[in-house]
Amino acid sequence: MTEKVTHVHHWNDNLFSFRTTRDPGYRFKNGHFTMIGLPNDERPLMRAYSITSSNHEPELEFFSIKVQDGALTSKLQNLKVGDEVLVGKRSTGTLVPDNMLPGRFLYLLATGTGLAPFMSIIKDPEIYDQFE
């Protein structure tokens, strides 16, 4: 499905994020990833990206590193508000709250784009019911 870019933020020389519109029927679990690509005249190049936004948010958000010679990231880092992005129709993944055992504490350690699924999870108020 095609979504429109609503916001782009360059955090530093190596990391940026972007938000897109979200089809009201698009469902995912916090911590899931989906395929992202850019429209073109040929078959689009798609890559897996963790969803940074929580499943209750009205937009989709993604983190990406900047790779100058990357087949997709070299183009994604030049996104502007209003550009179109292809988003896979399905999401998947195992780093989801349903797979986390309840306990006293929840530790989530990551850097860079590895933060994306964790940010999706910590924005979910229900995750805090599983931990003290």
Residue ranges of model-derived segments:
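Ferredoxin-reductase
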Residues: 1-81
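FNR/FR-type flavoprotein reductase catalytic core
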Residues: 71-132
